[in-house]
Amino acid sequence: MPSSKKKKENVPVMSMAGLIRYYEEEHEKYKVDPIYVIIASIVLVAVVVAVTKIIPP
């Protein structure tokens, strides 16, 4: 048997169709409230504006 024939037999049908399998055991990501992201971006903009006022580019 050619090696390509063996490889095709080992590949799941869903993978051959282009579908992705998601496993239940995935690493948890950090969960951040959207309000914290908004506050952090406003603070960052304020810091950048303040620094450009103090030290002109």
Curated annotation (Swiss-Prot):
Membrane-spanning residues: 34-55
Keyword field: Cell membrane, Membrane, Protein transport, Translocation, Transmembrane, Transmembrane helix, Transport
Name used for this protein in its record: Preprotein translocase subunit SecG
Compartment(s) of residence: Cell membrane
NCBIfam families linked: PRK01253.1
Family under the similarity heading: Belongs to the SEC61-beta family.
Cytoplasmic side: 1-33
A single GO cellular-component term on record: plasma membrane
Principal location class: membrane
Membrane topology summary: Single-pass membrane protein
InterPro entries named in the record: Preprot_translocase_SecG, SecG/Sec61-beta/Sbh
GO terms, biological process: protein transport
Function text: Involved in protein export. The function of the beta subunit is unknown, but it may be involved in stabilization of the trimeric complex.
Segments in the Extracellular topological domain: 56-57
Complexes and interactors: Component of the protein translocase complex. Heterotrimer consisting of alpha (SecY), beta (SecG) and gamma (SecE) subunits. Can form oligomers of the heterotrimer.
